[in-house]
Amino acid sequence: WGGAIFDSCIRYLGEDPWERIRKIKSMMPNTPQQMLLRGQNLLGYKHYSDDVVNKFVECSKVNGVDVFRVFDALNDPRNMQQALQAVIEVEGHAQGTISFTTSPVHTIDLWVDLAKKIQDMGAHSLAIKDMAGLLKPYVAFELVSRLKEELEIPIHMHCHATTGMSVATGVKAIEAGLDNIDTSISSMSMTYGHTPTETLISILDGTNRETGIDLEKLTPIAQHFQKVRKKYKSFEGSLRGVDARILASQVPGGMLTNLENQLKSQDSIDRFDEVINEIPKVREDLGFIPLVTPTSQIVGTQSVINVLSGSRYSTVTNEVKSLLKGEYGATPAPVNKDLQQEGIGESAVITCRPADLLNDDFQSVEEEFKNTIAEKNISAEASIENILIFAMFPEIGLNFLENINTPDYFESEPLEINEITDSSYLVTVDDQEYSVTLKADNSVTINGNSQTQEVSPSITSAVGAGKVIEAPLGGNIFRTMVSEGESVEADSTVLILEAMKMETEIKSPSAGVIGKIFVKPGDSVKPGTPLFEISS
């Protein structure tokens, strides 16, 4: 529970995430339930006030969470402190986390120092979160050996299999004294997942670290999830083995599949390799930050914009600006000064714990929630759970609560435009590859053979005296900032586009008068969709 699950439930599934954890706990009352908590970010993409953090942790514990794995995307321990203390206060298991990555500044000494700070905060255990599978076996042995020497609390490891090293890394970490390790049942393991449970049990069989788990009892579990997995085949990424590019790009498995899906939805999957190559450059510009939510989305979205727009940083997302300003905390290394100047100008950079600048907010959020559901006539209970949904996801949360009993609401159909260029894709169906080309005349060829395909665009080409500004990437219109007929200065924000869970400002290219606005909040758009018209 936690992590991206909460967001996915309310954004895509129309499912109450609180009800999910309650059901799981009721089915497994004797098994401790664990969640992934992004420190001061909770399950959202910005920092929340300390009282909101306290309320969320308390509510999660009441609803069935026992173990709280707390991490910070920048590995800034100040951003984990309040969440860890909140877990301790409700008598949960507080597991502090280091989000493993590699860079010139990330050394064994740095990790050990961070781990000691986490222990000093009162954490009951420490997790090594290797979200991209970058931890090499012998480095893992050295790291765990040092941590066992320096710490008194148990050490847990979470290592993805994307690079193919997870099994060896797990074995070497266990040899060094690792206490616990995450695995996946075999039918849901490897590639974007983890080391197979059965594999590690077999490796340790007959050793002094034998698990005692009966392999035969795992067989029906593996068979069950083998059937379940087939239902979700269309959502899986294209990776079938090992992707060694991750050793350079450091893209975690979850980020890989998200990028693939986003680029497919924007008819730009052919630019995937360019985006992968851009990611480490953006990451370095932002101070060698680890790629884990929300920084993975921040870096990923900016990389997509840099590639699709054809000009690096011609558009800088609000989240990148916030990171450059220090609103997410201290970066591992200094950020690119030129980018910082371009992004935030002369604005002062925050050096304190970012949440110290936030006033207690829960009571005001509660009042706003009650007023909003009354104004919009939303039949949602003003429960702590619903208020917390609203606190973390104001727009998405309200839409969820308003439409929770309307399943069709959670299926969005993108807008189309008349001008369509040739697009080629390599599609794999049942391990058989097909070359599919969508041509500008709306015809389709599969392996060179013509097919019939009708396309009915729902947005007509804009006609007018002004310049038409098009969407630089696909996403949903989050907010319009101006009205038709309004005068704007150059570089004024006209629209806010939400893409890959990040907000991107669409600005006026010059001073002028806004003509027709072709979209409204909630609309889905693709790259090239007309957004608005501006006349000088």
Give the location of each predicted region.
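Catalytic cores of alpha/beta
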Residues: D109-L114, T163-L178
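Glycine-rich phosphate-binding active-site loops on the catalytic face of alpha/beta enzymes
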Residues: V70, D130, A176-G193
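Conserved, mostly hydrophobic/aromatic
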Residues: V70, L126, G177, L200, ...
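Structured functional modules or segments
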Residues: I459-S536
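Terminal or standalone catalytic/regulatory effector modules within metabolic enzymes
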Residues: W1-C9, R240-D243, G254-T452
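Core active-site phosphate/anionic-ligand binding loop and the adjoining beta-turn-alpha structural block
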Residues: A168, G193, T197, I201, ...
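Active-site beta->alpha loop and helix N-cap motifs at the rims of alpha/beta catalytic domains
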Residues: G2-L114, Q119, L126, G133-P137
